[in-house]
Regions:
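Flexible C-terminal active-site loop/helix
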Residues: 249-291
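Alpha/beta enzyme core
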Residues: 2-232, 236-247, 283-291
Length: 291
């Protein structure tokens, strides 16, 4: 498949004057829903990948292969530019290079590489940051692994919540100088924090689920933020829906009394049944059941 168009569309958005909220997606159906509702891009988080693929918490036990395969499934289902959280690149700088190669092949439009020391080491009390020099090496490796120059490489740091504003700025400026296309910050809670960073760096900014006072698109746009996450509520809502439906059925509720379900029309839309009906008529001289 040709992934060029979606990467170009994402770069157009990043170069534009406004911040966007991407839709949080995790599989083919959720990506199609986001696309049908008009989201300009989708976001596939590492935590959600672990939940979806393994049923495991966000403790970095998912492999690159598993992550790339799920990203490909999402990408082939539609045309939504997909941003993905590639965590620490699944190892050292050499692993980062391969991570970029695999995710580019899977069709992603953008990926983040972070400077957190992952997975958590023996005896560690919590996450730590790798040295800036090591982070720069990872960013350079990511750029070296990229074949399609339209693929957006995002340098990410969680320093704001660990070491503060000054270290965040130092790290982001180093990654900017290394040549990444965009800068991602996790843990930003106040406007003062964002203002300080926005004044210190030149590249477009990407925020990961910031504090409540920052959810103002006009303000974010004026601070050169071009992408801002709203958490990953769709997956959480889906888990709750499955839980409550199965709970009701287990308790003896008749299936016909379960009302909060997708309509047949919505199911046909998200499974692209009309496409398959057309292909069945064209290639099989047959009608698709239920069309």
């Amino acid at each position: 498949m040709d992934w060029t168009d979606r990467r170009e569309r994402l770069r157009f958005l990043i170069a534009g004057p406004r911040c966007i909220y991407p839709g949080s997606v995790y599989d083919a159906i959720s990506a199609r829903i986001a696309e049908d509702l008009g989201f300009e891009a989708g976001m596939f988080a590492g935590s959600i990948a672990s939940f979806t693929v393994l049923g495991a918490p966000d403790v970095v036990v998912l492999t690159l292969t598993e992550f790339a395969q799920q990203a490909y499934r999402i990408n082939r289902a539609g045309k939504l530019p997909l941003l993905v959280d590639a965590d620490h690149g699944y190892g050292n700088a050499l692993s980062v290079k391969r991570t970029v190669e695999e995710l580019e092949t899977a069709g992603v439009a953008a990926l983040t590489i972070e400077d957190t020391a992952l997975p958590t080491g023996y005896g560690a009390s919590g996450p730590n940051l790798i040295p800036i020099a090591e982070g720069v090496g990872k960013m350079k490796a990511a750029l070296a692994g990229r074949q399609d120059k339209r693929l957006v490489i995002v340098g990410r740091t969680s320093a704001m919540a660990m070491t503060g504003v000054a270290d965040t700025i130092a790290r982001l400026k180093a990654y900017e100088e290394a040549g990444v296309d965009m800068l991602f910050m996790a843990g930003v809670k106040t406007r003062a924090q964002l203002d300080a960073v926005a004044a210190a760096v030149k590249l477009p900014l990407f925020l990961g689920s910031p504090g409540p006072e920052l959810y103002d698109l006009d303000y974010l746009s004026a601070r050169n933020v071009r992408i801002c996450l709203q958490g990953h509520l769709p997956f959480m809502a889906a888990v709750n829906a499955v839980h409550e439906t199965l709970k009701a059925l287990r308790a003896g509720t008749p299936p016909g009394h379960i009302k909060a379900v997708a309509s047949p029309e919505l199911m046909k839309q998200v499974t692209r049944q009309s496409d398959y009906s057309g292909w069945s008529k064209e290639f099989l001289n047959a009608s698709l059941s239920g069309a």
